[in-house]
């Protein structure tokens, strides 16, 4: 049997919670090497590092660009262990005959939608600040500073109404009796409206929402969709949540809005630059609650994601096309 090598790049959870997945790949395919590579590793160095590997299971970084694909003829499949694929040059991969796949967002929808709701509750109730006070021995000190917001009966705006955005909307609608507004130029209007979601333009959503949650894809048109101009249109003391992509917001403008009190709070599971540096200005603000792109880390979600990328490899072994190909091969 001709063994093929697998590189698992920057997916620290793979094989840890479900060691049988790692064992299965080694038995059915070949050696599996887990690697932690720098986010800024250039394509030439990456091509050299992955010489001799047939399959790559890829986390959120580093980036696979033309410099990689033009120098490495061994890799035949890059399976993204996630929804987004901004770290892979799809045109270059297609031109060089490398399949690129990803996880469809229905696999992650519960985990990410629940994370968005958790961030909203943490921000609106000042959970992180309150917990810190108790741990510091300040149970009775300045509790009035923890004055938060009641979620019931408010208006929630959802930007990006795909599987995850719609699931989050349902949590807010049925869990907190919220009115739901949505902005999504690509939405299936009939399907969205059947869920009791009101589609509207972006300005209306910004103006009328108490809470705004971002679930859009990152494109050149959506980059910095929430900028200083958009923030100025929002309700005073609104709360912004981002579990989509970091660059959907202008983080400098968000920080200014938090400091001025224009924005009551910001909760995010993503950042403009990942991993965030510990001296990132946004981390100096108590009104910002940031988690390290960890929304998918539930046992159910991780198990299903692992199984999907493993099946992509098995398809290739059988001479079949893997599922959810995103680069047009």
Sequence positions of predicted segments:
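N-terminal glycine-/charge-rich "phosphate-binding" loop or analogous flexible N-terminal tail
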Residues: 1-53, 181, 190, 317
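Rossmann-like dinucleotide/phosphate-binding beta-alpha-beta segment
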Residues: 18, 144-236
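An anion/phosphate-binding loop that grips the pyrophosphate of nucleotide cofactors and donors
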Residues: 53, 72, 208-209, 237
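Phosphate/diphosphate ligand-binding glycine-rich loop within oxidoreductases
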Residues: 53-131
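Short, well-ordered coil/turn residues at beta-beta hairpins
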Residues: 58-59, 81, 215-218, 243
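Rossmann-fold NAD(P) dinucleotide-binding segment
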Residues: 63-75, 221-240
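Oxidoreductase and adenylate-handling cofactor-binding alpha/beta cores
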Residues: 113-132, 174-178, 308-315, 320
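Rossmann-like dinucleotide-binding domain for NAD(H)/NADP(H)
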Residues: 237-329
């Amino acid at each position: 049997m001709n063994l093929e090598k697998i590189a698992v790049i920057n997916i620290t959870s793979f094989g840890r919670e479900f060691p049988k997945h790692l064992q299965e790949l080694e038995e059915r395919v070949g050696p599996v090497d887990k690697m932690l590579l720098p986010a800024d590793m250039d394509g030439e160095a990456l091509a050299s590092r992955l010489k001799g590997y047939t399959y790559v299971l890829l986390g959120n970084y580093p980036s696979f660009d033309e410099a990689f694909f033009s120098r490495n003829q061994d890799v035949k499949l890059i399976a993204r262990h996630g929804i987004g694929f901004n770290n892979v040059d799809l045109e270059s991969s297609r031109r060089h005959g490398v399949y690129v796949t990803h996880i469809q967002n229905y696999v992650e929808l519960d985990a990410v939608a629940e994370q968005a709701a958790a961030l909203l509750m943490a921000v609106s109730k000042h959970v992180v600040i309150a917990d810190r006070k108790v741990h510091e021995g300040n149970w009775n000190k300045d509790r009035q500073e923890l004055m938060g917001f009641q979620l019931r009966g408010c208006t929630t705006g959802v930007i990006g109404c795909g599987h995850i955005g719609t699931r989050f909307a349902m949590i807010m609608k049925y869990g907190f009796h919220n009115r739901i507004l949505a902005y999504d130029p690509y939405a299936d209007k009939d399907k969205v409206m059947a869920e009791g979601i009101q589609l509207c333009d972006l300005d209306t959503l910004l103006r009328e929402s108490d809470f705004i949650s971002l679930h859009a894809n990152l494109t050149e048109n959506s980059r910095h969709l929430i900028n200083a101009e958009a923030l100025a249109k929002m309700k005073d003391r609104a709360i912004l949540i981002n579990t989509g992509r970091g660059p959907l917001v202008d983080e400098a403008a968000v920080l200014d809005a938090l400091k001025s009190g224009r924005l009551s709070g910001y909760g995010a599971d993503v950042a403009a630059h990942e991993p965030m540096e510990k001296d990132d200005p946004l981390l100096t603000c108590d009104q910002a609650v940031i988690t390290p792109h960890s929304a998918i880390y539930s046992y159910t979600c991780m198990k299903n994601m692992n199984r999907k990328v493993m099946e992509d490899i098995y398809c290739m072994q059988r001479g079949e096309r893997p599922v959810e190909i995103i680069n047009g091969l």
